[in-house]
Amino acid sequence: MKKEIVLWTMLATATCATAQNGKFPTSGVCADSIQTENDSIKANQEAEIKADKEAEIQAVTVTGHRPMYKMRNDALVTRVRNTPLAKEPTLEDVLKHIPGMKQTSDGTLEVNGLGAPTIYLNDKKATSAELAHLDVKLIDEIELITTPGAKYDATTGAVLRILTRRTDEGIFGKMQVYDKLSEVNTNHEELTLGWVTKKISLTGFYGYTDNRYNVHQPQEALVRAKDGEYLFGTDRYGKNKANYNATELNFDWLLSKQHEVGIQWEGLWLNGGRSEKQQQYYRYPNPAGEDTNREMKLSDADGEMKYFDAESQQWGHQRSHHFNLFHLAKWSKHLSSQIYLDYARNKDSDSQPITEKEGSEMQETLNRSNSNYDIYSGRIEVKQLISDKHSINYGGEWSLMEGKGKTESSADMLGTTEYKNHDTKTAAYLQYQGGVGKWTWWVGIRYEHLTSRYTNLSEESPDNMERHYDQWFPSFGITLNEPSWHHSLSFRTTTARPSFSQLSGSIYYISRFQYQISNPKLQPVNTYRLTYSVQWKDFMGMLRYTRTDHSIMYIHEVPEDKPVRYVSTFMNFNKMQKYMAYLNWGHVFGCWRPNVNASITYQRFSVNDHGELISYNGATWNASLDNYFTLPNDYQLSLSYSFDNGGQVGKTKFSP
């Protein structure tokens, strides 16, 4: 009987692939080719295994398709290895195809509704150079966590965890060159060299990027004042160019099976520039007795709209260095720890000459700034296993930031400002994870204390300030895993603290009729998110409710003493609510693998403006379609399309 069992297994494997539930269907196996006997083989008895000649197998081929996307607890997992994504040229190209990720107008990637994610590479926060030269073929999977746990900083909106395979042993080198063309050309060249043994890994990297893109940005601001409505507008055309030189050295040493140490250095040299041409215009309120229903061209004191042209050049330079030491330890079967020590130094400067013309009048303005910052930080994470399904994570971190800077402007009211910043932060967290049967859950609490000081070095100034923040951040998640369904419900609180550029009381020049000033009364923004995720077969969906208290937004005002100018500043607003729905579907049809994403976010928000309640309710939606075609000789063709309607974000409305 043994021979028939072996033969049946081979035939079944050769003629089917796994179904959605992971089982092997046998409908394709022909019963005529399987022989069965009732006799059995006794212990210590030799058995001769024979196969029916008609059923002999010349070759065995197993064909199957694993889904690229699946839910794991409250995270979306994207499989890269052995999927079409493994053939994408760069990590950026892979991230574009992760459901929930989208590319902004300036080319950066963000998570829908949560901003740019914090990226971890094998559970260590990744540097920009690491991500730039990461070999896509080494990536196993990428986790998108939209409800990060208590161990993550309270300002973190989303987390990307990239898990890779270890590089093969030996000496290796890789050179990569790629070119991107839209309106203008962007090119990138990089070289990676390394030496890997069972215990030691030494790698070095150098990369150069010439990044260019053009921007067309029309913008209007309708400013309500006591004497009526002012209109200020800009039609901006910009050309942007940046040259990056990035270097990195990594040394990892596996001291034993339980301990690993490493050191890393990253350097970045950036030179960038932007040239801009603008046509700007403004209009006063209608004079008394003016017909407000007629065309709005003739509405200021002189009887017509005012126009002027502006040209500017902005050049920036940045130099940064980052050192990292780490120790990973497994002290016992149930106890492990991670320790990270970091030092970073950043130095940048920029200058911006502006020329503005209105008729025969011309005004020139020069803005310049520079800053130097040093950052020291340490972090420890401990994991204690209680049992196979229960564990406790706890840890803490400390950081110190010291910096100083200087801003100069030849414009009226501005002059020169020198300042100094000093920030210290301490944090601690505790998180419990458990599970019973089909259910898993986690619950965590995080505490953060932040002290921030700003000192104006130019003169004794009321701008000098010190702020203290003490906040608690709870979070939890619960998951139900069934054979065909996956359900997850999670909650998280986050914060966004105002920067000193928003608080200091400084004045920044934007144009001859627009200045930006700070607001020292700003409060932190607190956000509460409740998320439900579900997966069924090829479909994944998400519903999210977000409440934001004390949102920080721009407002525009017209000073009574200078009516030709308007002032942009920051202000806290009351409750804003957002409702988001998301759907993803993907399937395999022979050589064609389509994947469809769609999301919609509805915003509820209103503002009392000069006694009138103005509603900024509105919907924002986007959709994308990715198509992968498997071609002969291991080639792949991919076609993608995406669209969004711009929509309403806070008080600002965007066009597609």
Regions found by a protein language model. Give the residues of each.
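Transmembrane beta-barrel wall of Gram-negative outer-membrane proteins
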Residues: 184-212, 227-276, 318-331, 476, ...
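Short, acidic, small-residue-rich periplasmic hinge/interaction motif at the N-terminus
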Residues: 21-84, 104-106, 145-146
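Outer-membrane beta-barrel signature, preferentially recognizing the C-terminal barrel domain
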Residues: 420-423, 464-469, 495-549, 566-580
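N-terminal periplasmic accessory domains that precede
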Residues: 59, 91-94, 109-110, 129, ...
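Periplasmic plug
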Residues: 71, 102-147
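Outer-membrane beta-barrel translocator domains and adjoining extracellular loop/strand segments
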Residues: 188, 215-228, 274-304, 349-359, ...
